[in-house]
Amino acid sequence: MTMMTPPPVDQPEDEEMLVPNSDLVDGPAQPMEVTQPETAASTVENQPAEDPPTLKFTWTIPNFSRQNTRKHYSDVFVVGGYKWRILIFPKGNNVDHLSMYLDVSDAASLPYGWSRYAQFSLAVVNQIHTRYTVRKETQHQFNARESDWGFTSFMPLSELYDPSRGYLVNDTVLVEAEVAVRKVLDYWSYDSKKETGFVGLKNQGATCYMNSLLQTLYHIPYFRKAVYHMPTTENDAPTASIPLALQSLFYKLQYNDTSVATKELTKSFGWDTYDSFMQHDVQELNRVLCEKLEDKMKGTVVEGTIQQLFEGHHMNYIECINVDFKSTRKESFYDLQLDVKGCKDVYASFDKYVEVERLEGDNKYHAEGHGLQDAKKGVLFIDFPPVLQLQLKRFEYDFMRDTMVKINDRYEFPLELDLDREDGKYLSPDADRSVRNLYTLHSVLVHSGGVHGGHYYAFIRPTLSDQWYKFDDERVTKEDLKRALEEQYGGEEELPQTNPGFNNNPPFKFTKYSNAYMLVYIRESDKDKIICNVDEKDIAEHLRVRLKKEQEEKEDKRRYKAQAHLYTIIKVARDEDLKEQIGKDIYFDLVDHDKVRSFRIQKQTPFQQFKEEVAKEFGVPVQLQRFWIWAKRQNHTYRPNRPLTPQEELQPVGQIREASNKANTAELKLFLEVEHLDLRPIPPPEKSKEDILLFFKLYDPEKAVLSYAGRLMVKSSSKPMDITGKLNEMVGFAPDEEIELFEEIKFEPCVMCEHLDKKTSFRLCQIEDGDIICFQKPLVNKEIECLYPAVPSFLEYVQNRQLVRFRALEKPKEDEFVLELSKQHTYDDVVEKVAEKLGLDDPSKLRLTSHNCYSQQPKPQPIKYRGVDHLSDMLVHYNQTSDILYYEVLDIPLPELQGLKTLKVAFHHATKEEVVIHNIRLPKQSTVGDVINELKTKVELSHPDAELRLLEVFYHKIYKIFPSTERIENINDQYWTLRAEEIPEEEKNIGPNDRLILVYHFAKETGQNQQVQNFGEPFFLVIHEGETLEEIKNRIQKKLHVSDEDFAKWKFAFMSMGRPEYLQDTDVVYNRFQRRDVYGAFEQYLGLEHADTTPKRAYAANQNRHAYEKPVKIYN
């Protein structure tokens, strides 16, 4: 993901990343640029005579699907005295999503340096169910450079244009903007440390969720002290050690003057850049991080700290009403998940948590020795921890919409929380009543935005004083109690009205999308222990030394950077550098300037004084030095261009640098010419216009080696033949040795190296200062085979050579072999070389797959036979080039395979338990019937006349029975499992009063949610009218071969939309199920609840969860 220049105000992240509209082609919007204003109606609700600083604007856009302009603007509306409008791209701003921005309508005519800050939300209204309205919220400091801001990927166009979704009704779209204009913030000059005594954490891309959690943990001093006391050594690397990385982070938060980076910590988690750009679940991160620390604290002086701070216990109980039977189970917790929906406040959530559930009627409890009994089921707390972490369930699964939704309801939480209230109603009989469970609020973690992303920050009272602080990434501010508590309750807020009598409409209310999702309370009786003093003596000596050294180095760099404008960097290349580098590090041009000696000289220093520095460094007297300025030519080569004049050498170095390169950050690059005679320097001869400085490279075709030979000053009127003797002498050839000369002209984008006529003058050959001439002995002995017989072919090879790492596709992490190839190799050349390496007779049986540089995985689609022209096309991925290719060895030639479709089919035998996977390969135009016929030739059937069917299975559920006429080219077996099975006789003979139902295995997740998880193999079952569950159970037990002992533990439920309704043996199952042709019937099934004893196997990523549901993992 690429993010444009970040805004000056703290930037919330969203999954699509907030960006300004970078529509450079169309240029900035003009003040009056309104597209078809007469076709779009706009209304402003509650706009009194004087505009309030907060306002809601509604824009009705008719004929939406017929909009043929790329950009579309709303009417102008005024908020806080400023003019605004909404800008949309109906077909997306170069993406397959609707793009939508808030725009300053008169930006082009505003005075220089204008700026304004607004918090705003943009929405596309769902006109069928308003609760499904898509709304996104952000804030931005608008200025001339960024006069619009919003969301390039607001919502998928496929959803927007689908009339059944409710966003486009009668070809009309409703867009809403809620804008609050705030005081302009001077972001850049704000000093968090100076203003508050605390510093923030830098955001790596989408890590504000982690920053808010880390600040909360850091401000629990007992926790911080324990982290400091975890044993680490000076040999540990912070990027590989979580304890050391966390110690380092906490130390910097305590002693730095500016915000702190978290990259070391995320690297110690084993995260790559991609992980840092993923918005993870904060609650999950908290649990995983604490589990890791708990594990790493074992066997150390701080073992048990995590449990001491955060661990509490509750008792799950089931108590029979009519018989003397009670079952209890003690469980520990590190945090509690509290319901928000339907609860007024924290106390209401605790009431709900301990609410007694009655098990009666169809849901009786099976008590050992007593059979089915009416019972009470509930939870009571044995003890609470000193630090109580409450996770508020702001995100819930909406079964009707099949998606996650955010609960923005008002939910209150007190400054002081008394969990002993009403005579200890939350406590179990075993609880220690001498412990006073009175808690004080320490932290409020806030989420601003919607379910698909947003921004996280925290309000914290570090010492439990009356002063609150807001920790929002890099920025820390002082806040009052109202901001930390009441404003984070969520719910709705009324827009202010300056003239309540202006009309009789009720005040407009808008939903607040910023609200608390996690609360941290500290027990009053443990306050002094937890809010303890933490100072330098708690920090290991090696850590203090390391971090102070880091700080000093950082300060040196900062000082160096701050003084950079006073200095000029001069890089001096010499003959010795050319000799060292040509033929080893470089082949084209003359030198890599990053590897030559550089001097940092004050800009005002006279050049003559700099020459004295050079004399000291290289031992070359000042009078023997001559310096040449380098220049970039039009063909992108970089050569010495001209010597400095005596007048220039009287100037300061800064002036010379500026004359040679106007860029402020540019360096002054020079070539030092020193003349040698008997190894002693002599003054360089005076240079006239007739003199040309040339550089020479020697090529040895037998060894394929290029080296630097030296340089000569030649007359432009002379000819190459005049200097062949000197060149031979230079490299130790016989004086009359025949040599060929070539001019190295350029190497980008392709090599140009041309033969030089020895009898034509340098002037006529257009040879000038800084040109490079390569020479070699001609190949006389034709028996000697040379891959690159002449300079041009060798330079062509060097420019295009590419080392490629080949990996077997089934082992995508392991390099198997490396081949040196040419970027110009054709598809056929590449597969021939690979086949030769593998000892394969037929190269057409190889299939190659390119590498995805971002995911570090093979691309999903292989390279088609002769589908690319050259190796260079195989290695490129967007703007990056890889050096990895994956290969497969096929059993038939690739061109033949490309005309076929291969399906992976799992065959389930009617009587055998073993499932066998078959690869069925058929022409693409084949049908499912052809697949079944092919499969019949490969499998053993229970009887010769058995009929087969093909099913689509996903997440242990059956989604489709394929009709035999369906063509296979559109069937996807990458994400779905294709299952073939015999059709049972009873299904073939199904009667008019029978029903075919789905039967799935399931288990409930442990914990408060108790979400249903399917597992195992789903199947069909015929049920008959009037048949009871008991009769069906007998058939299921027989079908699945389950022992009586195990089967007695199974429960049976009618499942609809993911919710179980438990059945009794006497229930008639038939009545529960709708006909198969009724909408929604596919979501109804008979659920078999029992323990999952199937062997676990690693699913592919796409079988496990979607990319955006990536779990939090700390690998180290």
UniProtKB/Swiss-Prot annotation:
One of its GO terms (biological process) is proteolysis. Pfam families: MATH_2, UCH, USP7_C2, USP7_ICP0_bdg. CDD domains: MATH, peptidase_C19C. The active site is at 208 (nucleophile), 455 (proton acceptor). Residues 1-52 are annotated as: Disordered. The keyword Endoplasmic reticulum does not apply. Residues 54-179 form the MATH domain. InterPro entries: MATH/TRAF_dom (IPR002083), Papain-like_cys_pep_sf (IPR038765), Peptidase_C19 (IPR050164), Peptidase_C19_UCH (IPR001394), TRAF-like (IPR008974), USP7_ICP0-binding_dom (IPR024729), USP_C (IPR029346), USP_CS (IPR018200). GO terms for molecular function: cysteine-type deubiquitinase activity. It catalyses: Thiol-dependent hydrolysis of ester, thioester, amide, peptide and isopeptide bonds formed by the C-terminal Gly of ubiquitin (a 76-residue protein attached to proteins as an intracellular targeting signal). Residues 1-10 have a biased composition (Pro residues). Disruption phenotype: The double mutant ubp12 ubp13 roots are completely insensitive to exogenous applied hormone peptide RGF1 associated with an accelerated RGF1-induced ubiquitination and turnover of RGFR1 and are characterized by a reduced number of cortical meristem cells and disturbed PLT1 and PLT2 expression. Keywords: Hydrolase, Protease, Thiol protease, Ubl conjugation pathway. Residues 36-46 have a biased composition (Polar residues). It comes from the Eukaryota. Its EC number is 3.4.19.12. GO terms for cellular component: cytoplasm; cytosol; nucleus. Belongs to the peptidase C19 family. PANTHER family: UBIQUITIN C-TERMINAL HYDROLASE 12 (PTHR24006:SF942), UBIQUITIN CARBOXYL-TERMINAL HYDROLASE (PTHR24006). Recognizes and hydrolyzes the peptide bond at the C-terminal Gly of ubiquitin. Involved in the processing of poly-ubiquitin precursors as well as that of ubiquitinated proteins. Positive regulator of root meristem development that, together with UBP13, prevents the ubiquitination and turnover of RGFR1 induced by the RGF1 hormone peptide, thus influencing PLT1 and PLT2 expression. Interacts with SIC/RON3. This is Ubiquitin C-terminal hydrolase 12. It comes from Arabidopsis thaliana (Mouse-ear cress).
